[in-house]
Structures are given as structure tokens and as C-alpha cells.
Amino acid sequence: MKVAVVAVQGAVEEHESILEAAGERIGEDVEVVWARYPEDLEDVDAVVIPGGESTTIGRLMERHDLVKPLLELAESDTPILGTCAGMVILAREVVPQAHPGTEVEIEQPLLGLMDVRVVRNAFGRQRESFEVDIEIEGLEDRFRAVFIRAPAVDEVLSDDVKVLAEYGDYIVAVEQDHLLATAFHPELTDDPRLHAYFLEKV
């Protein structure tokens, strides 16, 4: 199984390690490639868009000509996982934390693949980084979620979206067909269950 991690910014090495562990968990050999250019996305079975700064990642994805091949992969039902900033990149709509509930356009490149509205930095400056055990549908035991200046979903825009996890007033993990997004960083734990759940979509 060949999995590409978009490697323009973010926790690429951490995703590589946890993907390999997830592969072992489900009995699959996982080859991880770092995707910086379109040719790196050829013949991949799944894609991960990691955390980082969503505006920067989006602009770098455009500069490296990754947007079109990513959209083509999505159209062909290739599984895509977005974590933290990756959730923002996958969202159809994004609003700033300062104005939740308002239709403020964010000037940043988005793939717009998931029918959700995401609030950037949803938990505010006072809770920029924290860890909490949450329940995730599809996983038997609670999962240690690491939030770092995390976004969150404040509105689901389609019945096609399945809510997998909530924390406080927000939705923090969603699934739509072959797409999966989390507000937290599952790659910053040693628990491969969420990545294994993702790989089982291949």
C-alpha cells in the first residue's frame, strides 16, 4: 500500500511513523512517500494532508502544483485524511475564530472537498494546546486527542457527512465517503488506531 503525505509543511515524519504502525496493525505493508510535487502523487492508494499553518500549506500546495492532482485523486475516490490544518484545507467553508457564525471569506486555497464549515483556532488563545481523551465512533476505547491551535467543525453542510467525534461545542472528527478529517493531531500519539481506520478505506 502506497500512501503519500503532503510534505510542504507540517508533521510529515510523525505521520510516516504512525502510518507504518497502522499498516502493521491491519496486516499491510505501507510505503510512505513525501509528496512535494505532482509526480509524487502518482499511483498512490491514499493521501494525508498534515497539520501546520493552513494558509501557508494551501499556498505551497498551489505553488508546487499539488491542488489539481489532489482533486483528481479525490474524484477517483482515493482516501484522503486531513489533520488539524488538513481539516481546514479539506473544508468547503472556513470562518475565522474571531467571528464564529458569520460568513467571512477566508483568503486561502481550499480543496473544498468536505461538506463542512470549519472555524479556525476554534478553542481560542487560552486553550491553544491541550490534550484530552475523547470517544471516536468506530474505535472501541477512548483516544488521546492532541489539539494545537486547533480548528473545528461548527456546521455540517450535508447529510453525507458523518460525525465521528465531538468535544465541547464543536465537532472534531468527520468522515464523508473516502474523506476523513480531524481537528486534532493523531500522529502526535503512539496510538495507530485512527490511521488504521483510515487505511482500511483503501
Curated annotation (Swiss-Prot):
Please list the residues that bind L-glutamine.
52-54, 120, 148-149
What Gene3D superfamilies does the record point to?
Answer: 3.40.50.880
> Sorted alphabetically, which InterPro entries does this protein's record hold?
Class_I_gatase-like, PdxT/SNO, PdxT/SNO_CS
Q: Does the keyword Hydrolase apply?
A: yes
CDD domains, per the entry: GATase1_PB
GO BP terms in the entry: glutamine catabolic process; pyridoxal phosphate biosynthetic process; pyridoxine metabolic process
Q: Which residues form the active site?
A: 84, 185, 187
GO CC list: cytosol; glutaminase complex
Which pathway does the database say it acts in? Cofactor biosynthesis; pyridoxal 5'-phosphate biosynthesis
Q: List the keywords (alphabetical).
A: Glutamine amidotransferase, Hydrolase, Lyase, Pyridoxal phosphate
Q: Which reaction does it catalyse?
A: aldehydo-D-ribose 5-phosphate + D-glyceraldehyde 3-phosphate + L-glutamine = pyridoxal 5'-phosphate + L-glutamate + phosphate + 3 H2O + H(+); L-glutamine + H2O = L-glutamate + NH4(+)
Q: What is its EC number?
A: 4.3.3.6, 3.5.1.2
* Single GO molecular function: pyridoxal 5'-phosphate synthase (glutamine hydrolysing) activity
Family assignment from sequence similarity? Belongs to the glutaminase PdxT/SNO family.
**Assembly and interactions?**
In the presence of PdxS, forms a dodecamer of heterodimers. Only shows activity in the heterodimer.
Give the protein's function: Catalyzes the hydrolysis of glutamine to glutamate and ammonia as part of the biosynthesis of pyridoxal 5'-phosphate. The resulting ammonia molecule is channeled to the active site of PdxS.
Q: Which HAMAP family match?
A: PdxT
Name the UniProt record assigns to this protein: Pyridoxal 5'-phosphate synthase subunit PdxT
Species annotation: Methanopyrus kandleri (strain AV19 / DSM 6324 / JCM 9639 / NBRC 100938)
